[in-house]
């Protein structure tokens, strides 16, 4: 019983460390844009609701993507070019522990929360600078045997934490 408890606690502790320090990603568009029931999704995140003339444009876009995908088997950008309501093609996406940022929008649990504030943008920029510095430090480190169980060895480098807006709402 004592061994089981110790192993369970050790497993919980190491998974907590790995989860809190290493789960983030950054990518640049274009991202997949889909339309369902007048709702636009970009990168599977709710982006906007269509209104007015955009409703017809959305239906035509969905039909064109369906045709390009299932009939023509042509996924080239010329065939599947999204309308402007899908957002800019060079948007950035950040997936942090606790939230995602796509373009100027904050999502938690894949639900839109709010647009980013100027302070949020500054935090993202600071995070990007810290990540660049962390990666440069990592490159300059001598080869090692890795990080057992996702834990940073004593005195090892740690990546920066995610922006505070991912944890404070």
UniProtKB/Swiss-Prot annotation:
<keyword id="KW-0964">Secreted</keyword>
<dbReference type="InterPro" id="IPR038412">
    <property type="entry name" value="Pepsin-I3_sf"/>
</dbReference>
<feature type="region of interest" description="Disordered">
    <location>
        <begin position="135"/>
        <end position="169"/>
    </location>
</feature>
<comment type="similarity">
    <text>Belongs to the protease inhibitor I33 family.</text>
</comment>
<dbReference type="InterPro" id="IPR010480">
    <property type="entry name" value="Pepsin-I3"/>
</dbReference>
<keyword id="KW-0646">Protease inhibitor</keyword>
<feature type="disulfide bond">
    <location>
        <begin position="33"/>
        <end position="79"/>
    </location>
</feature>
<feature type="signal peptide">
    <location>
        <begin position="1"/>
        <end position="20"/>
    </location>
</feature>
<dbReference type="InterPro" id="IPR051901">
    <property type="entry name" value="Protease_Inhibitor_I33"/>
</dbReference>
<feature type="disulfide bond">
    <location>
        <begin position="68"/>
        <end position="86"/>
    </location>
</feature>
<dbReference type="GO" id="GO:0005576">
    <property type="term" value="C:extracellular region"/>
</dbReference>
<feature type="disulfide bond">
    <location>
        <begin position="99"/>
        <end position="166"/>
    </location>
</feature>
<comment type="function">
    <text>This is an inhibitor of the aspartic protease pepsin.</text>
</comment>
<keyword id="KW-0873">Pyrrolidone carboxylic acid</keyword>
<feature type="compositionally biased region" description="Pro residues">
    <location>
        <begin position="158"/>
        <end position="169"/>
    </location>
</feature>
<dbReference type="Pfam" id="PF06394">
    <property type="entry name" value="Pepsin-I3"/>
</dbReference>
<keyword id="KW-1015">Disulfide bond</keyword>
<keyword id="KW-0732">Signal</keyword>
<feature type="modified residue" description="Pyrrolidone carboxylic acid">
    <location>
        <position position="21"/>
    </location>
</feature>
<dbReference type="GO" id="GO:0019828">
    <property type="term" value="F:aspartic-type endopeptidase inhibitor activity"/>
</dbReference>
<protein>
    <recommendedName>
        <fullName>Major pepsin inhibitor 3</fullName>
    </recommendedName>
</protein>
<keyword id="KW-0062">Aspartic protease inhibitor</keyword>
């Amino acid at each position: 019983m004592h061994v089981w408890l110790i192993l369970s606690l050790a497993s919980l502790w190491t998974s907590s460390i790995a989860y809190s320090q290493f789960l983030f990603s950054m990518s640049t568009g274009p991202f997949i844009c889909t339309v369902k029931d007048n709702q636009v999704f970009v990168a599977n995140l709710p982006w906007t609701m269509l209104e007015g003339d955009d409703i017809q444009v959305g239906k035509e876009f969905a039909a064109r993507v369906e045709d390009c995908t299932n009939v023509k088997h042509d996924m080239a950008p010329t065939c599947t070019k999204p309308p402007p309501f899908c957002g800019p093609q060079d948007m950035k996406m950040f997936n942090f522990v606790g939230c995602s940022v796509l373009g100027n929008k904050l999502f938690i649990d894949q639900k839109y929360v709010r647009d980013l504030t100027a302070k949020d943008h500054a935090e993202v920029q600071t995070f990007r600078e810290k990540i660049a510095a962390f990666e440069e430090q990592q490159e300059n480190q001598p080869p090692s045997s890795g990080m057992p169980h996702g834990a940073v060895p004593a005195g090892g480098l740690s990546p920066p934490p995610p922006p505070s807006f991912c944890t404070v709402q």
